[in-house]
Amino acid sequence: MDIEERISLVLKYPTEEVITVEELRELFQSGYKLNHYIGFEISGFIHIGTGVVSMSKVVDLQKAGVKTQVFLADIHSWLNNKLGGDLDIIRKVAVTYYVETFKKIIEVLGGDPDATRFILGSELYHHNDEYWLLLMDITRHLTLSQVRHSLTILGRKMGESIPLAYLVYPPLQVADVFALEAHIPHGGIDQRRAHILARQVADKIRFYPLKVDGKRIKPVALHHKLLPALNITSKPSSREELSEMKMSKSIPQSAIFVHDSPDEIRQKIAKAYCPPRDTEYNPVLELLRISAFREKRKTPLVIKRPAQYGGDLEVWSYEELEALYRDGRVHPADLKTATSEALITLLEPVYRYFQGPGAKLLEEMKNITITR
């Protein structure tokens, strides 16, 4: 595979941006074995945004010859009071439900689950003096203003009442990039600010400097699209506002969970926000794109329509679908039906796993989320 093909894999949907593509090209040209990482807080059930969107890029990176790493951020989750702030529960969920679910999704998407390294945050930090020196070093090169700017909208609005833990979080994220030797830190577009901080301190830190062939480099940040919540009632006004309106583990009707049954998927999609002719921030269109149009189709997607409205449509590409929807030739109800069936087909192996070998994991997660 040549360098341009590898770059195309990294840029492939659902990628939203790479900072920068030219630096990525230089990394590939070096011939150096590159490391990736994506980090996750440990909280509730895994939905299609966390699972399929994120892991689809992990699979792309595997194919591009990059060593992929999934960071299970137990300490970060504890700082953010996830799962009731119970660190033991957070760790248990991380190394069981999260690892096994991600592995299954990687397999379903055509990747190799065994080729991805899963790292628990507390294991990275344990007896690791250099990590803590790195963290302190990073704080020496960041201002309070920079850290505040990297917070979520909610965090920035809290003013003087913000918990100190929230301000510790961004430097921890930055430290993780370097401690994991991640040439390509990866996350949703909502992680952009933290990755920019990592790039800003890359040439200043003394510990864990990121190098390729002895030359110090900045990490190349990869950001994928966020899926809008199913239950939004209007379009977000900006990319940042979308990060506050994305699918949420804590709001079941906002998301398709990877273990949802076919009937649950149909019911959620039927109620989803899907304005006619509107293709921007349309969660139903985005779900159909990730489930049916990530790879070049070998057969057309059939969108069933009543005969009086022209009968069934055969669609070969997402661009064709988007144009048809914008022109009003595909009705929201027909789009929702097609999306539901595509999602059911994609997630069927995952659903079957949680009905069989993974049933105990799912039951344990249900019990944990109820008691938290």
UniProtKB/Swiss-Prot annotation:
One Gene Ontology term of the molecular function aspect: tyrosine-tRNA ligase activity
GO cellular component: cytoplasm
Catalysed transformations (reactions): tRNA(Tyr) + L-tyrosine + ATP = L-tyrosyl-tRNA(Tyr) + AMP + diphosphate + H(+)
InterPro entries: aa-tRNA-synth_Ic, Rossmann-like_a/b/a_fold, Tyr-tRNA-ligase_4, Tyr-tRNA-ligase_arc/euk-type, Tyr-tRNA_synthase
Major enzyme class: ligase
Record: residues binding L-tyrosine: Y37, Y169, Q173, D176, Q191
Subcellular location, record wording: Cytoplasm
Main location: cytoplasm
Binding sites annotated in the UniProt record for ATP: K249
Gene Ontology biological-process entries: tyrosyl-tRNA aminoacylation
Keyword Ligase: yes
Family under the similarity heading: Belongs to the class-I aminoacyl-tRNA synthetase family. TyrS type 4 subfamily.
Role according to the record: Catalyzes the attachment of tyrosine to tRNA(Tyr) in a two-step reaction: tyrosine is first activated by ATP to form Tyr-AMP and then transferred to the acceptor end of tRNA(Tyr).
Complexes and interactors: Homodimer.
Name of the protein in its database record: Tyrosine--tRNA ligase
Organism per entry: Pyrobaculum islandicum (strain DSM 4184 / JCM 9189 / GEO3)
